[in-house]
Design a protein with these regions (language model features):
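C-terminal segment of classical bacterial N-terminal signal peptides
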Residues: 17-25
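N-terminal secretory/targeting leader peptides
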Residues: 26-115, 135-317
């Protein structure tokens, strides 16, 4: 008899993230990979750099071919990997949290991948992917950043110290949509490559984005105000179809794992440095930063809204 998934595993994962001998010669295995963001964004460049490192280190064993941008739609990519239509994707965990609700614990994590590996959280994440979505979770890159809300007009704050988003047309996505709605915002769900046009036409006049990349997207042409503090943390997960993973020999698996772990460390350091540089640029160009008077309450709502969404989804399974 089908039973609802226990919340015990979710609680264990939340605690974790908040705090080969085979030598026979084989032909090179061809794998395919898709990615969700435009080619000019740093997160795509980082994913492609990791693939290049894997291909170099695993030469003769594995070659990952990268499919063109948008060859599979952004939010369809995780499902395509699960079904085996494509082998790998580098994508945020929130983009497929409907299938693995516990992914909210990754999006809201305040830990580095290295800490999560050490405390066993990465193993819990991988087990969930294997059991519920026919994937293996190999790690997450480009960590160390967070998200801000950027607005066209100066933000207003209510008497309770929280932002007043009445009349604000907020673009959202699966990462932070629940948070925005908990703050009373009217939201418009759209992918990142649709936002510039939406800003230009006045369809939206506010959006969240990571603490790095708004200048690459050129949204700062329209969004001249930032609401502080930063909330959540970035994760670009490297996930792979489980059957494709099991089809690799142990040596190839080890090379892929090793390169991902190295890139977790190097990309984190690089993104943090780049984020600081971009913030200086935004200040120099006149962007205004607005601290939320009730900053602690604001951050608590961000966490609570994500976990409420997670528990609601789990109860339906």
């Amino acid at each position: 008899v089908p039973t609802k998934r226990s919340l015990i595993t979710a609680a264990a994962l939340a605690a974790a993230v908040l705090a080969g001998s085979q030598t026979a010669a084989r032909a090179e295995t061809a794998l395919s990979l898709v990615y969700p963001f435009p080619d000019f964004l740093v997160y795509t460049k980082s994913c492609k750099a990791l693939v290049a490192n894997i291909n170099k280190a695993a030469a003769g064993q594995v070659k990952i071919d990268i499919k063109p941008f948008n060859s599979i739609k952004m939010f369809q990519q995780p499902g395509a990997v699960s079904k085996g239509a494509v082998d790998m994707v580098c994508t945020p965990a929130a983009f497929y949290a409907q299938k693995i609700p516990e992914n909210e614990a990754i999006s809201t994590s305040n830990s580095s991948p290295a800490i999560v590996r050490k405390n066993g959280g990465m193993g819990v994440i991988d087990d969930l992917h294997r059991k519920h979505f026919n994937m293996t979770y190999l790690g997450w890159i480009d960590s160390g950043l967070g998200f801000y809300i950027f607005t066209q007009d100066p933000p207003k704050f209510k008497s309770d110290g929280l932002p007043d988003f009445a009349g604000v047309k907020m673009r959202d996505n699966p990462i932070y949509g629940a948070f925005f709605r908990a703050l009373g915002a009217t939201t418009h769900n759209m992918s990142s490559n649709q936002v510039y046009s939406a800003l230009e036409k006045g369809v939206v006049n506010a959006s969240a984005w990571a603490s790095l990349g708004i200048t690459q997207l050129k949204w700062d042409k329209f969004l001249r105000h930032r609401v502080d503090p930063m909330f959540y943390h970035t994760d670009i997960g490297m996930i792979m179809n489980l059957d494709a993973w099991k089809g690799l020999n142990a040596a190839a698996q080890q090379v892929i794992k090793a390169e991902i772990v190295k890139h977790e460390v190097s990309s984190r350091a690089a993104r943090i440095a780049e984020s600081k540089a971009e913030e200086k640029k935004l200040i120099a160009e006149g962007m205004k930063f607005w601290p939320t008077p009730a900053g602690d309450k604001y951050l608590q709502i961000a966490i609570d809204s994500a976990y409420d969404r997670m528990t609601g989804r789990l109860k339906k399974m």
